[in-house]
Amino acid sequence: MEAACLVRSLGLPQGEEALKARLRRPGHPRLREALAAYLKRLQAPEEAFRALERLEVGAVVTGQQAGLLGGPALTFYKAHTALCLADRAGAAGVFWVASQDHDVEEVRHLHLLRDEVPETLSLDLPPLPSGRIPLAPHRERLRAFLGPWAKDYRLGYALEAETLSEFFARVLLAFLGERGLVPFDPMAEELAPLFLEALERELSDPLGSAEAINREAERIRALGGKPPLRRKPGATNLFLETDQRRLLFYEGGAFTDGVRRYTAKELWEIARADPSRLTPAAGLRPVFQDLVLPTAGFVVGPNELRYVAELSGVYARYGLAMPALFLRAFGVVVEPPVRRILEKYRLDPWAFVDEGEAAFLRAAEAWLAPFRAFRDRVEGLLQEASRLVEEAEALEPNLVRPLRRFRARVGGEAERLRRKLLAAQAARDEVLARHLGRLKVHLLPFGLPQERVYPYAMYALRHGEALRRLAEAPWEGRVALYLG
């Protein structure tokens, strides 16, 4: 079942009317103070500080793992949707930096397209949350890979970060801070203490949220859906970080991370000493987010929408109204060389993103049709000459020899025409192959949609108008951004 259909079937809140109905919900009483301190440490632009005032109205929240250079372009499309919705509601646009995530494979690669060649930097990162990974050991490799772009003042500012997650947050501020985007890093020293009350409550009933998820999963299955979240017996929705981040299980009145056992009191003492060590799993993270932030709207991708759809029971358990859910905008950047190719074949960029080579060959068919038509007409002339010889044999034998000479001359000329036609078509086929290759590199790198590979910061560094074009783009649906 499609994620959007599932959300409708479950009757979950969607749309701007639902967003407006959820405004003016209070966040954590120390939220503004903590965020102001966090933004001050990051030397955020004034627009981000001013956005804190709009938290009194509410927040439209989105989030993503802390990828290099802001991660793939979909990060900026999420932020764009959140900012547009927030502006329309008079609320703040907040970006949750998923610094607690320890899946480093998702964030250790940076892909850039330069001189028509995709280049990749892969960092060797420890299996830790990105909020724990220092940037210093990787700073020079990043600078070298970025080349002249590393001298851009925005990247100079971002590369001053202490950790990988801070680098990500600084990139967001450098490129989107002037639009008032407010990053929120739950592992930041200023912000992590805001989750203590939520942690205390979860520790008091450690299986309650997991059971709520499993009940909702059964409901979704009954509707024909495939719920992505399911908690194993005894699994909680909390991770504990020691030498690495491990899921906690609860049985017989005690917790275990598979290495040692803990009482609830011991875990609470760990959390009080350093609240960033006890963090929520995917099934609890949005609820923890909304216990601290005055979330009225939540912008997600299609896969996230599926797992958020399972959380209505967890929201109810915490006495929270689920925020209005919105799918992010989907974007594709079209630079001048690609635009010329697309226009030549009258090919829509999204058709190529969806179907790749098949869409291109369909569009190229019209370009090759004249060659085929001309070849068919030459073949027709040869066949007509042969028919004339056959008719002459029955009509007047004296015409046979001259008509055979005529057919031979026509055949010789036709063969020369055929060779020239093949050479011309081969040249055109070479052009087709070159054009197809260029489209793949730009729009479907590594066989994936562009928005999942190249960072939007790359386009902003290459094209001065890239951020303005994004700001002017629709906040929902599919968007083609023509640059250059």
Curated annotation (Swiss-Prot):
Protein family membership: Belongs to the BshC family.
GO molecular function, a single term: ligase activity
Leading EC class: ligase
Upper taxonomic lineage: Bacteria, Thermotogati, Deinococcota, Deinococci, Thermales
Protein's UniProt keywords contain Ligase: yes
Name of this chain's protein: Putative cysteine ligase BshC
Entry keyword set: Coiled coil, Ligase
Organism for this UniProt entry: Thermus thermophilus (strain ATCC 27634 / DSM 579 / HB8)
Signal peptide limits: none
The protein's Enzyme Commission number: 6.-.-.-
